[in-house]
UniProtKB/Swiss-Prot annotation:
Keywords: DNA condensation, DNA-binding, Virulence. One of its GO terms (molecular function) is structural constituent of chromatin. It comes from Streptococcus gordonii. Pfam families: Bac_DNA_binding. Belongs to the bacterial histone-like protein family. This is DNA-binding protein HU.
Amino acid sequence: MANKQDLIAKVAAATELTKKDSAAAVDAVFAAVTEYLSKGEKVQLIGFGNFEVRERAARKGRNPQTGKETKIAASKVPAFKAGKALKDAVK
């Protein structure tokens, strides 16, 4: 499994940037995606995939310790849908 540091190292090697500059670039991309999603906007990266905010409806839940039924409020969650090129690369 790759982590953020592995991603930074890969970006540094591919772009000939320093690891410090690569880390700044990776952080900037993550921050931009987060900012767009927090505003409810979709981020579409052709060939890679789409990041979007999906709404979860309110639903009934159950406390596993007591078995008591409870209401879970509606919420918004980030979601990612892989694009065709990414799906094909994974096959």
